[in-house]
Amino acid sequence: MTTPGKENFRLKSYKNKSLNPDEMRRRREEEGLQLRKQKREEQLFKRRNVATAEEETEEEVMSDGGFHEAQISNMEMAPGGVITSDMIEMIFSKSPEQQLSATQKFRKLLSKEPNPPIDEVISTPGVVARFVEFLKRKENCTLQFESAWVLTNIASGNSLQTRIVIQAGAVPIFIELLSSEFEDVQEQAVWALGNIAGDSTMCRDYVLDCNILPPLLQLFSKQNRLTMTRNAVWALSNLCRGKSPPPEFAKVSPCLNVLSWLLFVSDTDVLADACWALSYLSDGPNDKIQAVIDAGVCRRLVELLMHNDYKVVSPALRAVGNIVTGDDIQTQVILNCSALQSLLHLLSSPKESIKKEACWTISNITAGNRAQIQTVIDANIFPALISILQTAEFRTRKEAAWAITNATSGGSAEQIKYLVELGCIKPLCDLLTVMDSKIVQVALNGLENILRLGEQEAKRNGTGINPYCALIEEAYGLDKIEFLQSHENQEIYQKAFDLIEHYFGTEDEDSSIAPQVDLNQQQYIFQQCEAPMEGFQL
C-alpha cells in the first residue's frame, strides 16, 4: 500500500482526480502486456537435452547390449513409426543390459530428431511407466540417468506430453533423485523438473506441492559443476514464474537467500536466471517487494544494470522496475543504490525494449514524492525522456509520457516549470493525435497540470495571463484539444471541453464551440470523424 503522505498528497492537493495513486504508480497493467509479458528469446521455459556428437560416439562404443545406432535401419520397425519392435521387446525384458540399451535408443530418438517422436513414444503402451520404473533402480545409476533423460525430453514437449510424465508418477521420484549420490542423475532430475514446472502454473504448483524446494536448494550448498548450477537456477526461476495465479509466496520465498548469492556468480546464464527469478518474486504487492528488499539484493541488481550482456540487463531491469512499484520507502531503497545514473545510461540503449523498460521504471519513480522527483531532475534524466518522447518508437514514448505526466502531477511549481523550460509541452501536445486513448488522457493530464500551475502564477503576479496557454497554442495543442471534443471516448472529450472552457475560453467566444447535448441520452452529440491509424495530422 502507498504511504499515507503520498495518498493524501495525490488526492487532496490536486483537482485532477483522474490520475489517482494506483494509476500513477502502475503495476504491470493489462494494456502493457507487450512490454510487461513480452516473449523473451533470452529465456526458455523448456529445454530439450540433445547429445553432442562426441557424447554419441562414446555411448556407441560403450553400448552394453551390442546394438549400435547404425543397426537401427536394419531392424524391423513398429507399424507406422520409428520405434522398432526390438526396442519395445528390450525395454520390457528382464535383462538390465537390454533395458539400458533400449532406453539409450529411445533417448537418442528423442534427442536427435528436429521433431522428436514424442507422441509415438508416449502412445506406445507401457513405455512411459517403464521409464518411470527405471528411475527407481538405485543399483543402476546409468539406467536411472538414461531414463531420466528420456522423460526430460518428453516433458520438453507440449502440455499434453508433459502431463503424461506427471500422470506416470515421475515428479516425486525426480525430487527424490535430487538427493542421488550421482551428480549426472541429480542434474538430469533437475532438468526434468524444470521442464515440468515450466509448462504451466498448474504443473508449477504441483511440483511445489511435492516439496521440491528443500532438496533443490540443498543442491546449491555443494560445490557443483557449472551445468548443474545453471540447470538448478533455471528450474528455480520456473518455480517462481507465472502470474495467473502466481505461486504461493510462502512456498517460493525460501529461495531468496540462495538467489541473493547467485547474483555474484560470474556465469551469464546463472545471473540471468537468478535475475528472472527475482523479477517474478518482486512482481506483486508490497509485502512481496519488501521480502525481496530484505534479501539484500537491491544494490547488486542495480550494479547488474550495467552488465555487458543484455541477457542479464533485461531481467535485472525488470526486477528493479518491479521494486519501484512499491511505496516511497521501497522506491527510496533503489534510489539509495545510485540507480538513476544506470537508468540514464539505459535510456540511450540501442535495444528498444531496454529503453522502454527503463522509461517505465523511471515513471514509477516520478510517481513518488517531490524529493524523489528532484533526484530524477538532479540526475539530468528529463532531457533524455523528452528526447525519447519526440523520437522513439511509440511504445517507448508512452512510457516516457507517463514519467513526465507523473512528475507534473506530484511535482512542485519549480519542478513543473523546469519541465516546461526543457520543452515538454510540444511532445505532450503531439501525443494528443495518437489512437491510444489512454496515452491521450495521460498527455491531457500533463497539460492540465501545467495549465493549473500557470493559472496560479497569473493570479499571483496579477497579470491574469496564463503563460502556458500561449506555449500550448504555439505547439498546435489548442487545435488538437479542440478536435478532441469530438473524440469517441467520453472522458477524453469531457476533459478536452473542460480545458477549453476553463483555460482558453473567452466571454465573447462563439458558443458553437460547445458540443450539443442530447437531453434524452444525457450525453454530448458530436460529428463522427474517421481517424487514420497513425493519428490525426494537424
Swiss-Prot record:
Protein name: Importin subunit alpha-5
Known function: Functions in nuclear protein import as an adapter protein for nuclear receptor KPNB1. Binds specifically and directly to substrates containing either a simple or bipartite NLS motif. Docking of the importin/substrate complex to the nuclear pore complex (NPC) is mediated by KPNB1 through binding to nucleoporin FxFG repeats and the complex is subsequently translocated through the pore by an energy requiring, Ran-dependent mechanism. (Microbial infection) In vitro, mediates the nuclear import of human cytomegalovirus UL84 by recognizing a non-classical NLS.
Domain notes per entry: Consists of an N-terminal hydrophilic region, a hydrophobic central region composed of 10 repeats, and a short hydrophilic C-terminus. The N-terminal hydrophilic region contains the importin beta binding domain (IBB domain), which is sufficient for binding importin beta and essential for nuclear protein import. The IBB domain is thought to act as an intrasteric autoregulatory sequence by interacting with the internal autoinhibitory NLS. Binding of KPNB1 probably overlaps the internal NLS and contributes to a high affinity for cytoplasmic NLS-containing cargo substrates. After dissociation of the importin/substrate complex in the nucleus the internal autohibitory NLS contributes to a low affinity for nuclear NLS-containing proteins.
Subunit structure, interactors included: Heterodimer; with KPNB1. Interacts with ANP32E. Interacts with ZIC3. Interacts with NSMF; the interaction occurs in a calcium-independent manner after synaptic NMDA receptor stimulation and is required for nuclear import of NSMF but is competed by CABP1. Interacts with APEX1. Interacts with RAG1. Interacts with CTNNBL1 (via its N-terminal). Interacts with AICDA (via its NLS). Interacts with SNAI1 (via zinc fingers). Interacts with DCAF8. Interacts with ITSN1 isoform 2. Interacts with TALDO1 isoform 1.
Taxonomy of the source species: Eukaryota, Metazoa, Chordata, Craniata, Vertebrata
Per-repeat ranges for ARM: 77-117, 118-161, 162-206, 207-245, 246-290, 291-330, 331-372, 373-412, 413-457, 460-504
SMART domains xrefs: ARM
Compositionally biased region (Basic and acidic residues): 20-36
Motif Nuclear localization signal, residue numbers: 42-51
Modification type Phosphothreonine: residues: 3
Region NLS binding site (minor): start-end pairs: 318-406
